[in-house]
A protein has these predicted regions:
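Non-catalytic extracellular/periplasmic "stalk"
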Residues: 1-77
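Catalytic cores of peptidoglycan-degrading enzymes
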Residues: 66-198
């Protein structure tokens, strides 16, 4: 009988130990699952942050005026030069691209036409706003092909090269502005095959 009673006690102790081990195992499993859930949430946040960053970079790239706007050669570069009208030194805020009258001018990036009209000195002119602080300006156009408020896509024809305003021959006066400050347009052309003749 002592043997039988001991066996029952041993069986009971083993069963309690097994239940305790199962409870510990379930407790550890629960903790591991909670930790895994926290890690998944952190990774999801990181993935979301990376996705948002890449989306912003893509939008910025689409807004960057990286396409050369017309065929021709650069007849006057950005920076210091002598004015063709006064003979005095001046800062040229863009580049002049000499081309035959009627040569298509294309949008260098997606954007919205924020000015389409006539300006003193520049004749028929356009301003495109691209986002991320970028704007581009086109002067001496023969004819504007787009209207104020119109959305344009990179590569779309927006005007034709002309000789309007104060001009010594058919050309496009092209400016790139970042936060309303003029920058050398040549610095934004990313396709080497697109680089203009200098």
């Amino acid at each position: 009988r002592a043997v039988g009673g001991g066996s029952l006690e041993l069986a009971k102790a083993l069963k309690e130990g097994e239940q305790a081990s199962q409870a510990q195992l379930l407790g550890r499993l629960y903790q591991d699952l909670e930790q895994l859930e926290r890690e998944i949430a952190l990774r999801a946040e990181s993935l979301q942050a990376v996705t948002e960053y890449l989306s912003r970079q893509k939008d910025r790239l689409v807004a960057t005026p990286a396409l050369w706007p017309t065929e021709g050669y650069v007849s006057s570069r950005f920076g210091p030069r002598t004015s063709p009208f006064t003979g005095q030194p001046q800062h040229h805020t863009g580049v002049d691209i000499a081309a035959p009258p009627g040569t298509p001018i294309r949008a260098p990036a997606d954007g919205v036409v924020t000015f389409a009209g006539t300006l003193p000195g520049y004749g028929h002119a356009l301003v495109l706003t691209h986002g991320y602080g970028f704007k581009t300006f086109y002067g001496h156009n023969q004819r504007n092909q787009v209207s104020k408020g119109q959305t344009v896509k990179r590569g779309q024809v927006i005007a034709l090269v002309g000789n309007t305003g104060y001009s010594t021959g058919a050309h496009l006066h092209y400016e790139v502005l970042l936060n309303d400050q003029p920058h050398d347009p040549l610095k934004y052309v990313v396709d080497e095959g697109q680089r203009p003749k200098l």
